[in-house]
Amino acid sequence: MINRLMIATAAVVLTAPLAMAGPIDSACVRSDRGARNAQLCGCIQQVADRTLSRSDQRRAASFFRDPHQAQEVRMSKSNADNAFWARYRNFATTAEAYCAR
């Protein structure tokens, strides 16, 4: 009986996809709004995985802690910040459309 239980447990562990929260999901869940809707945070992370690099995800996640930082990036004259902001806007628009369903 114990062997069957161990085999069943191993099968579940080995075949289940890894449930690793990304930086956007983690920041969202820790935020005031995210604590009430973990499913939405997961959806937003899925969009981030498709539209942002891991580095961009970490940068975007920091906006949950410090929203003013987003404004600083948006208003920046730096080419790198402007390029990031274009990618971030694409991510936000896509997440809004995809996760609103």
Residue ranges, per PLM feature:
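Classic N-terminal secretory signal peptides
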Residues: 1-21
